């Protein structure tokens, strides 16, 4: 009770605490008014390092339709590689979608981006720890691991703060417990971004992830599709106001509304496979495949602009995040947006995106959605509903461990009251510009009612698919989403199990506390807790469970809350009273259920039992429960529990018990009549519990179911439906989701994949098988419930109450069926689990305790976390002890006693189990209440401390203001004085200037006169001096002329004398030369005469000789003539002579030729010698060449060998580098987790298990390069 009150108070306080306008300005704001709250965004910053410390920053951004963002950094939260990859994938898809969305609603993007991006992503990241991780390494590796245990955890944590944004997004704090498990799952795919961007309430989307909401949506999917289509129209009408992702908000919002429902639901399964509208269809085309892949993103962004709008918000948020987290946040935001969109759609009318979902989602879902069923039948049905309604459940189912499903209901949250509802200002697109005040065209209560109805319908549908797995349209769409999520979640679940590995505080103390409380009080408190949270949650269909509960508990109070949060806080304070009042206002049935949750369960059960019996009969007659039967059952339940039916989660809870009972009854009939009786008792108890839980289990159980708490409600409903005979399905899913809690994360992973396969092959058997694997270890069911709780962390109210209610229901159910059923479940997983129902209940109990522990770990604010741990641990210990004893007793009883006694013993055991379950539930509720109260106390203390600081600052500032005013007065007087002095100085200055001018003129005149006189004086003196100098120069010139004349005469006289001397010397030398010349002439003439005489003699001699020769010539000529005459007489002789001469010429020619030939021969000989030498050299070179070739061959062989060796070494090096990179990445991740807080450290064991899973990949990848070396 205190926890719920604290939640509501915190919601109110937070809402009032911060409000952010479109511009992103934060101001104190009381989000009582639903319209503003719609756009309000709340951020909860939880330091993972200090789980006890929780800072809740509540920001209401009317402009920003994206919901509140909760930043939760929990030590318990563990980030996984899958989460990272999931976020990456989301980032890519969401970024793309964001881009589209941004274009559609840039104002929204701009507004929300800076503010919410960090909050949403950071909150989820902080909450999940994975979100934080994504911000670091997380940046969400695209498509790598969309399903991440970390995400689930983060979602759970977020859901822990699942502020039921009834009026304000503040409810996230109140929904600590619920939001925890489901929020985690939701967050798994889009927790951070979707949260914020989607439906203004990141937390909301996380909460919505709960299986309750999924279930409700599932059922609603069938008939709400029309509603959803109508909401599509409504969004266009109130698009700016209500549908963030609606046609008006988004350009293609109208189509988007239905698509959002479907695709948000599917989106978890296939991130973008469902983009109906063209704007996001291309994204769908791209991401649809990815989504079909386990897309943790969760919400598949419908083609419609609305989804894009959500993504836009998500994108904005992610954009505002600076680091890798931004990408992660984009993804997360995308997820959140998608989830939010789906949730919003669900929440609005929860028209359940069913129409679009069935259209596109169904196609994809058939192939892979079965896998989701494999993961958990309940999960599958949830997934179906969720797929139809919102992929949150699927995210929880598929990727509850690591997948962040929260984003789906993020949008819903924003709507406060089904923010998604057409009335809500969920305008994520352009409508963001319009003030959020206008957003709430429909009252939060109406929106909540719509959402609840839709969720109820969805829940029914979801349950129907679970039990039936036949409704192809609903089941397949949800399955598709679930399948994708399941595929991803299998790994994520294992990791999620790691989240449960938190150190548990002393259980004894918690037990003592729980024991001190009255049983009914805790339940009422839990119900009230759950109810307030559901109310808040009902504000947003993502937190459909919480919002539904809110609506169920106080639809009118919701409007009251919107009108006056303070009144709501007061109501919360008087938790039981208000809860009763709320129930009264909403429905007397709801009040009765919440008050008489434990005792009234049988009463309600009787009414519901008949319906459930009918449903069970129908299910027994038809293994796949027909949608009609399920709907009929829901209608009956609605008649029995009108309020419950209004609150979708109540319907879901009721319907789930029916389905559970159906499958258990079937198996009970198969096994024995006793099992049938037990099942009937269980059904009665479960009906009561579910009716009772519908309020607080409605949201919580839905959240739990959606987030992966298939054991509590999901197990009861979805698991029991599909795996009721094989009750182990629920536990395995929970275990898988809570692999962080489980000791065998890898085993759980293995189980979850198997389960997924089985689900794809056959919904129930697969889920049962998975449950069996999970059931092998009872602690795992606890982890699973913990995981479930984690996933509804934001929907903490729903999750914890749902745990309590589910626990009580399951306890009742298990009590009816008997402890032997638990043993049977363990021994015979398929039948015993839900046959007896005790095992299911029992299983839920451990899960609940662990879920509580996990919720306590994750959601508690401040010391409340430790208390939660202690309480949950104590509960779990007692639960574990009880289960063992129960198991032992059933085994011994049937052996020792006859059948009748065995039946009696089983009945007594079932009663004991019911009582113990109620006790455990009450303890859990007490622990949850304590935790919530402590969280509220921490928040209040924080707010009070801040208020005191603000008051101190106000005082100091006021004093400073007074001082400044005094100083201002003094300064003003001083300024006036200075002004006067300045004026005086100005006048003096002007007078001085005039005087100066006058003096200047006078002095100039005087100076002119003075200088003129001086000038004249100087001129006269200058003239006088010039004349003097002229006279002096003239005298000097005359003197110089006289001296020159005298020197000239002297020089002329000396020159004449010299000339005479020279003439005499010349004449003497000339006479001498003439004499010498004459002598030489005479000698030469003598020589000439002599030579002439000698030459004449020679001439005479030669003439005589010439004559003699002439004579000889004549005689010779005569002789020749004579010979010629003789030759003429002998011609032969002449011929011979000629021949002789010719022969001589020929001989000469021949000789020349021979000489040339000799020369040539010499040359040839030389060439031959040279040739032989060259030949020898050639041979030598050839031999050398051959040797070199041989050596070259050897070298080539060696080089080839070396190259091959080098390639092998290079491959080995690459492998080692890859291994080193992986190890380094894992090491960084582990270090980051260690750095983020102790909560993540317990999850290391699952992380270690994840490492071995990756090592096989490395080992497998290594051989491939070795096989084909480069």
UniProtKB/Swiss-Prot annotation:
Modified positions (Phosphoserine) in chain numbering: 381, 399, 443, 629, 1203, 1224, 1245, 1255, 1259, 1261, 1264, 1268
Residue(s) carrying Phosphothreonine: 186
Tissue: Ubiquitously expressed (at protein level). Highly expressed in brain. Down-regulated in ovarian carcinoma, pancreas carcinoma, colon carcinoma and head and neck squamous cell carcinoma (HNSCC). Isoform 1 is the major isoform in most peripheral tissues. Isoform 2 is abundant in most peripheral tissues. Isoform 3 is the major isoform in brain, female reproductive tissues, thyroid and heart. Within brain it is highly expressed in corpus callosum and pons. Isoform 6 is brain-specific, it is the major isoform in cerebellum and fetal brain.
Subcellular location(s) per record: Mitochondrion; Golgi apparatus; Cell membrane; Nucleus
Residue ranges with Acidic residues bias: 1-14
Chain spans, region Disordered: 1-50, 184-236, 524-560, 592-622, 701-815, 1237-1270
GO CC annotations, alphabetized: centrosome; extracellular space; Golgi apparatus; microtubule; microtubule cytoskeleton; mitochondrion; nucleolus; nucleus
Alphabetical keyword list: Cell membrane, Coiled coil, Cytoplasm, Cytoskeleton, Disease variant, Golgi apparatus, Membrane, Microtubule, Mitochondrion, Nucleus, Phosphoprotein, Tumor suppressor
Coiled coil: 940-1231
MF (Gene Ontology): microtubule binding
Basic and acidic residues bias (residue ranges): 212-228
Compositionally skewed regions (Low complexity) per UniProt: 38-50, 197-211
Consequence of changing residue 186 to S: In HNSCC cell lines
Biased composition (Polar residues): 533-556, 701-710, 759-776, 797-815, 1244-1270
Family: Belongs to the MTUS1 family.
Medical condition linked: Hepatocellular carcinoma: A primary malignant neoplasm of epithelial liver cells. The major risk factors for HCC are chronic hepatitis B virus (HBV) infection, chronic hepatitis C virus (HCV) infection, prolonged dietary aflatoxin exposure, alcoholic cirrhosis, and cirrhosis due to other causes.
Role according to the record: Cooperates with AGTR2 to inhibit ERK2 activation and cell proliferation. May be required for AGTR2 cell surface expression. Together with PTPN6, induces UBE2V2 expression upon angiotensin-II stimulation. Isoform 1 inhibits breast cancer cell proliferation, delays the progression of mitosis by prolonging metaphase and reduces tumor growth.
Subunit composition and interactions: Homodimer. Interacts with AGTR2. Interacts with PTPN6. Isoform 1 associates with microtubules.
PANTHER family: MICROTUBULE-ASSOCIATED TUMOR SUPPRESSOR 1, TOUCAN, ISOFORM A
Stated name of the protein: Microtubule-associated tumor suppressor 1
Lineage of the organism: Eukaryota, Metazoa, Chordata, Craniata, Vertebrata
Gene that specifies this protein: MTUS1
């Amino acid at each position: 009770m205190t926890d719920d009150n604290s939640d509501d108070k915190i919601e109110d306080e937070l809402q009032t605490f911060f409000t952010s306008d479109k511009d992103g300005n934060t101001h104190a704001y009381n989000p009582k008014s639903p319209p503003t709250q719609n756009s309000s965004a709340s951020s909860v910053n939880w330091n993972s390092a200090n789980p006890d410390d929780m800072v809740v920053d509540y920001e209401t951004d009317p402009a920003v339709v994206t919901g509140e963002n909760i930043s939760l950094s929990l030590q318990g939260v563990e980030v996984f590689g899958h989460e990272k990859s999931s976020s990456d994938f989301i980032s890519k898809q969401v970024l793309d979608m964001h881009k589209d969305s941004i274009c559609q609603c840039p104002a929204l993007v701009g507004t929300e981006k800076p503010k919410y991006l960090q909050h949403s992503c950071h909150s989820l990241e902080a909450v999940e720890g994975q979100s934080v991780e994504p911000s670091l390494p997380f940046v969400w590796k695209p498509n790598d691991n969309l399903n991440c245990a970390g995400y689930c955890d983060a979602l759970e944590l977020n859901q822990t703060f699942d502020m039921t944004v009834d009026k304000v997004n503040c409810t996230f704090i109140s929904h600590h417990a619920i939001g925890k498990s489901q929020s985690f799952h939701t967050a798994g795919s889009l927790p951070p971004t979707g949260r914020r961007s989607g439906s203004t309430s990141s937390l909301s989307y996380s909460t919505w992830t709960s299986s309750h909401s999924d279930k409700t949506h599932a059922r609603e999917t069938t008939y709400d599709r029309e509603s959803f289509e109508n909401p599509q129209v409504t969004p266009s009408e109130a698009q700016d106001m209500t549908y963030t992702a609606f046609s008006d908000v988004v350009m293609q919002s109208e189509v988007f509304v239905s698509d959002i429902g479907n695709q948000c639901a599917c989106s978890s399964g296939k991130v973008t496979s469902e983009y109906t509208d063209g704007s996001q269809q291309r994204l769908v085309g791209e991401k649809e495949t990815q989504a079909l892949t386990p897309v943790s993103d969760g919400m598949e962004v419908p083609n419609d602009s609305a989804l894009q709008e959500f993504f836009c918000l998500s994108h904005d948020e992610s954009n505002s995040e600076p680091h890798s987290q931004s990408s992660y946040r984009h993804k997360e935001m995308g997820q959140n947006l998608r989830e939010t969109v789906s949730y919003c759609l669900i929440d609005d009318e929860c028209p359940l995106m069913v129409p679009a979902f069935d259209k596109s989602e169904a196609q994809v879902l058939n192939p892979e959605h079965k896998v989701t069923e494999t993961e958990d039948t309940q999960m599958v049905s949830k997934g179906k509903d969720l797929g139809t309604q919102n992929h949150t459940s699927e995210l929880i189912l598929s990727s509850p461990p690591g997948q962040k499903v929260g984003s789906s209901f993020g949008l819903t949250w924003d709507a406060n009251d089904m923010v998604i509802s057409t009335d809500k200002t969920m305008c994520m697109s352009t409508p963001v510009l319009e003030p959020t005040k206008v957003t709430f065209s429909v009252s939060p209560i109406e929106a909540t009612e719509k959402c609840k109805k839709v969720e109820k319908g969805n829940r029914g549908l979801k349950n129907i698919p679970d039990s039936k797995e036949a409704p192809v349209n609903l089941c397949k769409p949800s399955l598709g989403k679930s399948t994708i999520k399941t595929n991803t979640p299998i790994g994520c679940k294992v990791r999620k199990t790691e989240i449960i590995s938190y150190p548990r505080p002393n259980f004894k103390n918690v037990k003592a506390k729980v024991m001190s409380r009255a049983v009914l009080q805790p339940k009422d408190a839990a119900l009230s807790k759950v109810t307030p949270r559901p109310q808040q949650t009902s504000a947003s269909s993502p937190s459909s469970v919480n919002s539904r509960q809110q609506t169920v508990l106080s639809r009118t109070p919701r409007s009251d809350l919107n009108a006056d949060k303070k009144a709501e806080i007061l109501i919360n304070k008087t938790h039981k009273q208000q809860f009763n009042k709320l129930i009264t206002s909403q429905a007397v049935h709801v009040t009765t259920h919440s008050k008489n949750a434990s005792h009234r369960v049988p009463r309600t059960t009787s009414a519901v039992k008949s319906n459930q019996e009918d449903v069970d009969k129908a299910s027994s007659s038809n293994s796949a429960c027909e949608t009609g039967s399920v709907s009929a059952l829901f209608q009956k339940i609605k008649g029995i529990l009108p309020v419950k039916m209004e609150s979708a989660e109540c319907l879901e809870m009721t319907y789930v018990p029916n389905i559970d009972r159906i499958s258990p009854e079937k198996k009970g009939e198969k096994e024995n009549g006793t099992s049938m009786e037990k099942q009937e008792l269980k059904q009665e108890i479960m009906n009561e519990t579910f009716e009772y839980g519908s309020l607080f289990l409605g949201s919580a159980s839905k959240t739990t179911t959606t987030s992966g708490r298939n054991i509590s409600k999901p197990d009861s409903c979805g698991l029991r439906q599909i795996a009721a005979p094989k009750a182990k399905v629920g536990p395995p899913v929970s275990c898988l989701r809570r692999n962080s809690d489980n000791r065998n994360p890898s085993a759980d992973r293995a189980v979850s994949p198997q389960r997924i396969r089985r689900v794809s092959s056959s919904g129930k058997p697969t889920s049962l098988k998975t449950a069996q694997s999970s059931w092998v270890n009872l602690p795992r069911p606890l982890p699973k419930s913990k995981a479930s709780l984690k996933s509804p962390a934001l929907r903490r109210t729903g999750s914890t109450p749902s745990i309590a209610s589910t626990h009580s229901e399951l306890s009742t159910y298990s009590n009816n069926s008997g402890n032997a059923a638990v043993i049977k479940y363990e021994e015979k997983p398929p039948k015993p689990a839900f046959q007896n129902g005790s095992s299911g209940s029992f299983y839920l109990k451990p899960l609940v305790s662990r879920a509580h522990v996990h919720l306590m770990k994750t959601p508690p604010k401040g010391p409340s976390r430790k208390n939660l741990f202690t309480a949950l641990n104590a509960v779990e210990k007692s639960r574990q002890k009880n289960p063992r004893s129960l198991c032992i007793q059933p085994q011994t009883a049937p052996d020792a006693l006859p059948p009748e006694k065995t039946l009696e013993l089983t009945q007594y055991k079932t009663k004991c189990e019911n009582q113990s379950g109620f006790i455990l539930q009450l303890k859990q509720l007490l622990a949850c209440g304590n935790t919530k109260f402590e969280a509220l106390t921490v928040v209040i203390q924080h707010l009070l401390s801040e208020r005191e600081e603000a008051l101190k600052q106000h005082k100091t500032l006021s004093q400073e203001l007074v001082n400044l005013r005094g100083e201002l007065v003094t300064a003003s007087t001083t300024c006036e004085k200075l002004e006067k002095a300045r004026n005086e100085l100005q006048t003096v200055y002007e007078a001085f200037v005039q005087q100066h001018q006058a003096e200047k003129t006078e002095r100039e005149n005087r100076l002119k006169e003075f200088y003129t006189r001086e000038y004249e004086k100087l001129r006269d003196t200058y003239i006088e001096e010039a004349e003097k100098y002229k006279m002096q120069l003239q005298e000097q010139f005359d003197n110089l002329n006289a001296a020159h004349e005298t020197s000239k005469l002297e020089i002329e006289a000396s020159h004449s004398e010299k000339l005479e001397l020279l003439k005499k010397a010349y004449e003497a030398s000339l006479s001498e030369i003439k004499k010498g010349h004459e002598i030489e002439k005479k000698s030469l003439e003598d020589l000439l005469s002599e030579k002439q005489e000698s030459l004449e003699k020679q001439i005479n001699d030669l003439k005589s000789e010439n004559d003699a020769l002439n004579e000889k010539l004549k005689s010779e000529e005569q002789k020749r003539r004579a010979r010629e005459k003789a030759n003429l007489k002998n011609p032969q002789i002449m011929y011979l002579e000629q021949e002789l001469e010719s022969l001589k010429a020929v001989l000469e020619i021949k000789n020349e030729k021979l000489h040339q030939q000799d020369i040539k021969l010499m040359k040839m000989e030389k060439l031959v010698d040279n040739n032989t030498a060259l030949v020898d050299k050639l041979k030598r070179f050839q031999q050398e060449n051959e040797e070199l070739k041989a050596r070259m061959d050897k070298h080539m062989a060696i080089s080839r060998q070396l190259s091959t060796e080098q390639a092998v070494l290079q491959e080995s090096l690459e492998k080692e580098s890859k291994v080193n990179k992986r190890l380094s990445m894992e090491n960084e991740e582990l270090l980051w987790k260690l750095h983020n807080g102790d909560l993540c450290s317990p999850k290391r064991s699952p992380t270690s298990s994840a490492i071995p899973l990756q090592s096989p990949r490395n080992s497998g990848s290594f051989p491939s390069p070795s096989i084909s070396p480069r």
